[in-house]
Amino acid sequence: MSMATIARPYAKAIFDFAVEHHSIEHWQNMLAFSAQVSAHKQVTQWLSGVMHSEKTAQIFISLCSDHLDEFSKNFIKIMAQNGRLSLLPEVLKQFMALRAMINSVIDIEVFSAIPLNEDQKKKIIFALEKRLQLKVTLNCKIDESILAGVIIRHGDRVIDGSVSNRLKRLKNFLLS
């Protein structure tokens, strides 16, 4: 079974709990910190060792105590009992995906040769939100190889409005 498949029910359970208790931000922060702790090299080695789950939970909770309330501690105990503390980074990833879905927000990558100004970003966001009927956040990256224009990417969808792409198409047309 993949890590995502195993992590999904944990993420769904705590996401539903967080929504019900109006504490999504708290749970995301707790998961982010706990996932960072569990991904630390020494902690990863320790988690892979054989140890009683109650003791594992106690030690892990003590490492993260400033970021945990009673509900979070219970969640960590359940994860430890099931030997799943090493999955916290994947649980966080799934939790954030659920949060994005409920807010109908999608993250779009935009590649440009130079940094986009705020007006350009607003125009791109407006056009994409109108087309996709979802709230859009941009993840802007610089790629000087495109020369000018932008490449917009979401999942397997790509809108290539770059000069380098236009030059390639012109070259192919002239060679044919």
Swiss-Prot record:
Keyword Signal attached: no
- Membrane-crossing segments per the record: none
- Where this protein primarily resides, as one coarse class? membrane
Entry-linked Gene3D superfamilies: N-terminal domain of the delta subunit of the F1F0-ATP synthase
A GO molecular-function descriptor:
proton-transporting ATP synthase activity, rotational mechanism
Q: Which PROSITE patterns match?
A: ATPASE_DELTA
Asked whether the keyword Transport is assigned, the reply is yes
Q: What membrane topology does the UniProt entry give? A: Peripheral membrane protein
InterPro entries per UniProt? ATP_synth_OSCP/delta_N_sf (IPR026015), ATPase_OSCP/d_CS (IPR020781), ATPase_OSCP/dsu (IPR000711)
- Please provide the record's keywords in A-Z order: ATP synthesis, Cell membrane, CF(1), Hydrogen ion transport, Ion transport, Membrane, Transport
Quick one: a GO cellular component term? proton-transporting ATP synthase complex
User: Where does the record place it?
Assistant: Cell membrane
Q: Self-association or partners: how does it assemble?
A: F-type ATPases have 2 components, F(1) - the catalytic core - and F(0) - the membrane proton channel. F(1) has five subunits: alpha(3), beta(3), gamma(1), delta(1), epsilon(1). F(0) has three main subunits: a(1), b(2) and c(10-14). The alpha and beta chains form an alternating ring which encloses part of the gamma chain. F(1) is attached to F(0) by a central stalk formed by the gamma and epsilon chains, while a peripheral stalk is formed by the delta and b chains.
User: What is its biological role?
Assistant: F(1)F(0) ATP synthase produces ATP from ADP in the presence of a proton or sodium gradient. F-type ATPases consist of two structural domains, F(1) containing the extramembraneous catalytic core and F(0) containing the membrane proton channel, linked together by a central stalk and a peripheral stalk. During catalysis, ATP synthesis in the catalytic domain of F(1) is coupled via a rotary mechanism of the central stalk subunits to proton translocation. This protein is part of the stalk that links CF(0) to CF(1). It either transmits conformational changes from CF(0) to CF(1) or is implicated in proton conduction.
Q: Which family does it belong to?
A: Belongs to the ATPase delta chain family.
The name under which this protein is listed is: ATP synthase subunit delta
Organism of provenance: Hamiltonella defensa subsp. Acyrthosiphon pisum (strain 5AT)
